[in-house]
């Protein structure tokens, strides 16, 4: 499994990339492999408030539907509209073109509650 060292992670298999005051969020390689072929993504609307560990998006595969959780409190500033027409980007490029949404975070200190790459690797074995 690919677990980039420069990202943060949640126990619910989201990855987080810090981009100034914003963060970009997607699901991990482990999560997309468990879901198998992604066929639909329900994206959050720009401007939607997000609460930590509360579902904000849904990824559906041929196998299951899975909630995607906001890793920290913030406001949605961008959603990856490319997933509407090509949800398989989550499978083919989960850490790049397969990102799901971006948040403007309310408090950068909240990021301290997220996992390092090593902690996430330990979690998934």
Task: Indicate residue ranges for each PLM-predicted region.
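Histidine- and aromatic-rich ligand-binding microenvironments
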Residues: 67-71, 104
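Acidic, low-complexity mobile loops and tails
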Residues: 1-58, 88, 92-125
